[in-house]
């Protein structure tokens, strides 16, 4: 795995995690 795919994996993980937090927050979790 090169640094480019590793970086993209990190970005997508953080984006998904933050998006999930926003959804949970709006649902009152």
Curated annotation (Swiss-Prot):
Example of a GO biological process term: cytochrome complex assembly
Membrane association type: Single-pass membrane protein
Gene Ontology CC entries for this record: chloroplast thylakoid membrane; cytochrome b6f complex
Quaternary structure, from the entry: The 4 large subunits of the cytochrome b6-f complex are cytochrome b6, subunit IV (17 kDa polypeptide, PetD), cytochrome f and the Rieske protein, while the 4 small subunits are PetG, PetL, PetM and PetN. The complex functions as a dimer.
Functional description taken from the UniProt entry: Component of the cytochrome b6-f complex, which mediates electron transfer between photosystem II (PSII) and photosystem I (PSI), cyclic electron flow around PSI, and state transitions.
Family label: Belongs to the PetN family.
Identification of the protein by name: Cytochrome b6-f complex subunit 8
Organism: Thalassiosira pseudonana (Marine diatom)
């Amino acid at each position: 795995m090169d640094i480019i795919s590793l970086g993209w994996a990190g970005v997508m993980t953080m984006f998904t995690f933050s998006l999930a937090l926003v959804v949970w927050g709006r649902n009152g979790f």
